[in-house]
Amino acid sequence: MPAEGSLAQEFVQFAVESGVLRFGQFKTKAGRMSPYFFNAGLFDDGAKLGRLAQFYARQLLAEEQRSGLAFDMIFGPAYKGIPLAAAVAIELARLGRNLPFAYNRKEAKDHGEGGTLVGAKLQGRVLIVDDVMSAGTAVRESIALIQAAGATPHAVAIALDRQEKATENGLDVEHSAVQYVTRQLGLQVCAIARLSDLLQYLSEKSDSPSGGETLDGQRLKDHYQSVLAYRERYGVN
């Protein structure tokens, strides 16, 4: 489910100002040339990561009120999901919701506690926390790990839903990775913001007297048409 409008717009502005959401020409995993790029790895200091966790927590608590979303613990898939899961768990605890969290290693450890899982025991309804969902590979791998541990994959929280067609065998299909996870795998997906929110942000900045200058001095209105054209070519509803 998408975030409430003002929260989504606030998040998009934060991502742009932090340099996490950038504009230009970027090649995606699917081989497309995208006019924007969301790099969650650039939430790279305590203040930015802490604020990012606040957005996740606000969206999750809002979704709890809106749809009854409930979960018993948090799981972060390696690698980007690891700090996200920890940060979101800290923020939820600060807000009075103290939940266990866990994550996985890419490589199994053959000494100490061993295995690929670290943190709390996977049990109950598990929320998977990641940055974006391009092909859904990390989510499918997480689902397999969670089920193998005897727990239930219940929902996924991401920062940005790109709202674009997924690919299968190198060909575009008429659904996004998020829609596949929702419809075929039966997991609720909560996104802080979507591509439609980014377009709204760019449109509103384009109409401002300043033309919406970014941190590098470029005008955001210069990117609106390219992002819109990308959405029209590859987008899903």
UniProtKB/Swiss-Prot annotation:
The keyword Amino-acid biosynthesis does not apply. GO terms for molecular function: magnesium ion binding; orotate phosphoribosyltransferase activity. One of its GO terms (biological process) is 'de novo' UMP biosynthetic process. Transmembrane segments: none annotated. InterPro entries: OPRT, Or_phspho_trans_dom, PRibTrfase_dom, PRTase-like. 5-phospho-alpha-D-ribose 1-diphosphate binds at residues 29, 79-80, 105-106, 109, 111, 130-138. GO terms for cellular component: cytoplasm. Its EC number is 2.4.2.10. It catalyses: orotidine 5'-phosphate + diphosphate = orotate + 5-phospho-alpha-D-ribose 1-diphosphate. CDD domains: PRTases_typeI (cd06223). It comes from the Bacteria. Orotate binds at F37, F38, S134, R162. Catalyzes the transfer of a ribosyl phosphate group from 5-phosphoribose 1-diphosphate to orotate, leading to the formation of orotidine monophosphate (OMP). PANTHER family: OROTATE PHOSPHORIBOSYLTRANSFERASE 1-RELATED. NCBIfam families: pyrE. This is Orotate phosphoribosyltransferase. The gene is pyrE.
